[in-house]
């Protein structure tokens, strides 16, 4: 919430787990930057921190709400999701299943990116292929609207049988 890329946090753990967690932390980055920790402690305890958090909430709420509206408008018949109360992502599941990795290739060709959801599950199972994670933190509301329109087109094209005419009378190849 203050310095992008700075990761400061804490873990509450049993006394037995502590030495393992210390080794895990040390094996990843040795230690967190002390100046960063000092700055973070000062900032989160400052009188301006609550106002800063409210600005961030308003900023991301606008984008979340824009994505919710765009999803409803463009993907309401194709997918299901729950609007997040926190975080920066929507988890979307295609109603008729599918392979979001294959969709990603087509979406990237049209300059739209998302993360196939399968990578976030502990075991690779075909039923997880219908999930995707959509990030709303970087795009403007206008970009989100455009991105969801393109994504809906890509999903519909992907579902059209090869060589069959689609609703516009065009042949899918």
Located regions from the model:
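Conserved core segment of the aminotransferase class I/II
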Residues: 1-58
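Short, flexible turn/loop "capping" segments at secondary-structure junctions
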Residues: 2, 82-84, 125-128
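Short beta-strand segments
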Residues: 10-12, 83, 89-93, 116, ...
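Conserved C-terminal alpha-helix-loop-beta "cap" of PLP-dependent enzymes
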Residues: 17-18, 92-133, 141, 145-146
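Conserved glycine-rich beta-strand-loop-beta hairpin in the small C-terminal domain of fold type I
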Residues: 41, 54, 58-68, 79-93, ...
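Surface-exposed helix-capping loop/turn segments at secondary-structure junctions
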Residues: 51, 71-81, 159-163
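PLP-dependent enzyme catalytic core of the Aspartate aminotransferase-like
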Residues: 109, 125-173
């Amino acid at each position: 919430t203050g310095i992008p890329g700075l990761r400061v946090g804490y873990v509450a753990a049993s006394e037995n787990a502590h030495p393992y967690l210390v080794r895990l932390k040390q094996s990843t980055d040795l230690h967190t930057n002390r100046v960063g920790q000092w700055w973070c402690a000062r900032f989160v305890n400052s009188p301006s921190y609550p106002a800063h958090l409210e600005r961030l909430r308003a900023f991301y709420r606008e984008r979340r709400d824009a994505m919710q509206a765009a999803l409803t408008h463009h993907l309401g018949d194709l997918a299901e999701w729950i609007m997040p109360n926190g975080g920066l992502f929507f988890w979307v599941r295609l109603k008729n299943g599918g392979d979001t990795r294959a969709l990603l290739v087509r979406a990237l060709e049209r300059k739209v990116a998302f993360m196939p959801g399968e990578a976030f599950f502990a075991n690779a199972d075909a039923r997880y292929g219908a999930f995707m994670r959509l990030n709303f933190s970087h795009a403007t509301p206008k970009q989100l609207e455009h991105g969801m329109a393109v994504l809906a087109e890509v999903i519909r094209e992907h579902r059209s049988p090869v060589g069959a005419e689609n609703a516009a009378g065009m042949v899918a190849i």
